[in-house]
């Protein structure tokens, strides 16, 4: 199997960290989605990364679905409970972190078009702020939700260095600083 992804995709980074933690070899094929490469469109007609191409040629798309596949590939994995409250806590935390990424990417696309202010932009910043406040209360381990939170805030630091998320979220800062120093995160750091 191989992961079609861009080097700076935070969604792909989440999957690369998960694979690393699970001991899964996950080759990455650097893919530029805006170029509509044939391999990506064959795997995901939406033209979005990441996409996981399996050995039989079939594909799994969307980072939460790929994450679920990776977790299911390792019986007895310790990154997420298979059922019960712990499972749903991790999935909900993953959704919050992915929502932060969604809002941040909307802001990046808007900035590329010169849109840096207005109700839609303000709404994205408010969504990020609210989600971070909740994530600040949900972190503390090293499971799926924790990984997703660290990826999200590291992406904010990477793409929005002037955004002051750290001063309001001390638990999230401590959590991210701890996880970002681990081998899985160091190995998947995006290029500058």
List the model feature ranges, each with a label.
Residues 37, 191-192:
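Short, solvent-exposed loop/turn elements at beta->coil junctions and helix N-caps
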Residues 97-177:
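GST-like fold's C-terminal all-alpha helical module
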Residues 1-119:
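GST-like domain detector, emphasizing the conserved glutathione-binding G-site
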Residues 75, 102, 140, 184-185:
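Generic structural signal for secondary-structure transition and capping sites
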Residues 67, 71, 91-94, 132, ...:
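Non-transmembrane alpha-helical segments in soluble domains
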Residues 55, 150, 191:
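Conserved residues at the C-terminal ends of beta-strands
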Residues 77-82, 106, 165-166, 186-191:
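Short, hydrophobic secondary-structure boundary micro-motifs
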């Amino acid at each position: 199997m191989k992961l079609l992804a861009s080097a700076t995709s935070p969604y792909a980074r989440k999957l690369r960290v998960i694979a690393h933690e699970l001991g899964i070899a996950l080759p990455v094929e650097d893919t530029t989605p805006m170029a509509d490469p044939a391999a990506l469109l064959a795997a995901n007609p939406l033209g979005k990364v990441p996409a996981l191409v399996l050995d039989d040629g079939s594909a799994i798309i969307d980072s939460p679905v790929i994450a679920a596949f990776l977790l299911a590939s390792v019986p007895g994995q310790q990154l997420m409970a298979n059922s019960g409250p712990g499972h749903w806590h991790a999935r909900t935390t993953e959704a919050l972190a992915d929502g932060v990424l969604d809002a941040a990417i909307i802001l990046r696309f808007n900035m590329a078009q010169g849109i840096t202010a207005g109700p839609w932009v303000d709404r994205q910043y408010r969504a990020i702020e609210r989600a971070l406040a909740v994530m600040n209360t949900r972190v503390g381990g090293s499971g799926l939700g924790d990984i997703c939170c660290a990826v999200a805030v590291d992406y904010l630091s990477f793409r929005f260095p002037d955004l002051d998320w750290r001063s309001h979220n001390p638990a999230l800062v401590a959590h991210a600083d701890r996880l970002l120093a681990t081998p899985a995160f160091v190995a998947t750091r995006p290029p500058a």
